[in-house]
Amino acid sequence: MNGFGRLEHFSGAVYEGQFKDNMFHGLGTYTFPTGAKYTGNFNENRVEGEGEYTDTQGLQWCGNFHFTAAPGLKLKLYM
């Protein structure tokens, strides 16, 4: 698949965004079965670059993501 699409996994996880060669690639949103979600850049099925993670409590964390590491994430505060 290439272009924009939606993939629903039997676990309840959902990816909606850009695909390239059947992989998550470009901008997209991955929603975990728990309700947490990541919105941002993907590169060959991996989170890579600028993005935002919303945890199960609704707290939003933004910054640079590099596969399994996300050094320097910042918590977004709304005042």
Curated annotation (Swiss-Prot):
An example Gene Ontology CC term for this record: acrosomal vesicle
Main location group: cytoplasm
Pfam families according to UniProt: MORN
GO biological process, one term: cell differentiation
Keywords: Cytoplasmic vesicle, Differentiation, Nucleus, Repeat, Spermatogenesis
SMART domains from the UniProt entry: MORN
Keyword Repeat among record annotations: yes
Tissue: Expressed strongly in testis, where it is specifically detected in haploid germ cells (at protein level). Also expressed strongly in skeletal muscle.
Cellular compartments annotated: Cytoplasmic vesicle, Secretory vesicle, Acrosome; Nucleus
Chain positions of MORN repeats: 15-36, 38-58
Keyword presence, Heme: no
Family annotation (PANTHER family): MORN REPEAT-CONTAINING PROTEIN 2
Function per UniProt: Might have a role in spermatogenesis.
Record's protein name: MORN repeat-containing protein 2
Gene this chain is encoded by: Morn2
